[in-house]
C-alpha cells in the first residue's frame, strides 16, 4: 500500500477517482483545505492498494501548541483488511520524520471499536472526553512516546 497526497488541484475526472467515495473525499478536502490551509506534509492522503483507492487519512491541520491530530477512514468494502492500521502507521511516521517532538493525537467516537483498537495497538492512550465539531463528545487519544512502537507487529 502507498499514500497519495490529496492535492489542491486534483483532476476529479481521472479514472482513479471514479468511485463515489473518492468523489466525496475530493469535495470534502476542497473545502477543508480552504479552512485549514494546505501545508505539506500536514494534509490529506488517499490510501492506494494495487492502483485502487481504498481509503484516506491525514492530519487535521498543522501542529498547534506542539500537537497534531491524525484521522483515517477506510472505504466500507475494504474494512477489516489492515488499511486503517497502515494509515495510522504512515501518519505517525510522517509526523515523527517531520517533527520528532510533536505530540500525536487522535479522536474517536466515545465507544470501543476497531479504530480504538488500532490506536491502542499503536500505543495511544485515552486522555479525556473532548468536544469535536463533527462527533460531539469524543475520546481524545495521545500517542505514548514513552513506549516503543514496533511497526512490524501492528
Tell me the role of every PLM-derived stretch:
Residues 1-24, 31-33, 39-154:
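Acyl-donor (CoA/ACP) binding surface of acyl/acetyltransferases
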